[in-house]
């Protein structure tokens, strides 16, 4: 049996991108939830290159008297997961909770995650109940969840919900991973010995609009497939074998038909030959596109560029920037 260490300090990591309308309420509610824990805590807000007034508001929040807020300002937009990784690199707590800034997942759920982590779990995930998203977002989320479960073999119910708790050793393990394409919930589950999911409330978005457009969801799906598993390459090899066998069978059939019915029939079969040809060409292009995705990610990783660049870090203990 492994010794269960009680949580002493909680770090809440929240990526922020153009959320100036929700920030005051986010800070108030998150601070209140953390105060109710009766433990040490810090709230890390990472500005992911916002074009509105979010960065300035974060700096002011960190410099306020009695603040527990650490503001991390990135020089441009790197994406949600890169921003969270930037926050992970500055946490000091032994339990790290991630939360979205849109308040669709209430900060009031934080004490429940801490209590469950205190039972000895490495990762505490969440499943959104009564989701208040559009039909398209719900459908896309279900498809992505099923895709992840099949390709990774990790049976988690809601990978899209970022309200999660991670023990410090899980976060440290993730920080040692250097791939550019990172999907934090899956990466954490790879290192977790004990993981669990709990149901949480899901509210309507009150401020702003979702940052995930249709194309960003498509890009996310491609990224998940190509960065998490080589199964599509194996499926591509299998598909190529099936097509090759099918093509050979059709060729044999065409020879037999020509010998049976003569050259006149062969002339009338030109369109079928074109159809078969276009089928093979289409399959080749699909395969080349998939290989291109993998090669592109290999190229990106080989360059070894940083995931993000931190421009400033403002801690509540000092008004000086790091």
UniProtKB/Swiss-Prot annotation:
Q: What spans does the record annotate as topological domain Cytoplasmic, numbered to this chain?
A: 1-235, 291-322
Please provide, in alphabetical order, the Gene Ontology terms of the cellular component aspect for this entry: plasma membrane
The record's annotation in InterPro entries points to: ArnC_tfrase (IPR022857), Glyco_trans_2-like (IPR001173), Glycosyltransferase_2 (IPR050256), Nucleotide-diphossugar_trans (IPR029044)
Answer whether the UniProt record assigns the keyword Nucleotide-binding to this protein. no
Drop me one GO molecular function for this one: phosphotransferase activity, for other substituted phosphate groups
Pathway of this protein? Glycolipid biosynthesis; 4-amino-4-deoxy-alpha-L-arabinose undecaprenyl phosphate biosynthesis; 4-amino-4-deoxy-alpha-L-arabinose undecaprenyl phosphate from UDP-4-deoxy-4-formamido-beta-L-arabinose and undecaprenyl phosphate: step 1/2; Bacterial outer membrane biogenesis; lipopolysaccharide biosynthesis
Q: Does the keyword Chloroplast apply?
A: no
Parts of the chain that traverse the membrane:
236-256, 270-290
One GO biological process this protein is involved in is:
4-amino-4-deoxy-alpha-L-arabinopyranosyl undecaprenyl phosphate biosynthetic process
Q: Which reaction does it catalyse?
A: UDP-4-deoxy-4-formamido-beta-L-arabinose + di-trans,octa-cis-undecaprenyl phosphate = 4-deoxy-4-formamido-alpha-L-arabinopyranosyl di-trans,octa-cis-undecaprenyl phosphate + UDP
Q: What is this protein called?
A: Undecaprenyl-phosphate 4-deoxy-4-formamido-L-arabinose transferase
Taxonomic lineage of the native organism: Bacteria, Pseudomonadati, Pseudomonadota, Gammaproteobacteria, Enterobacterales
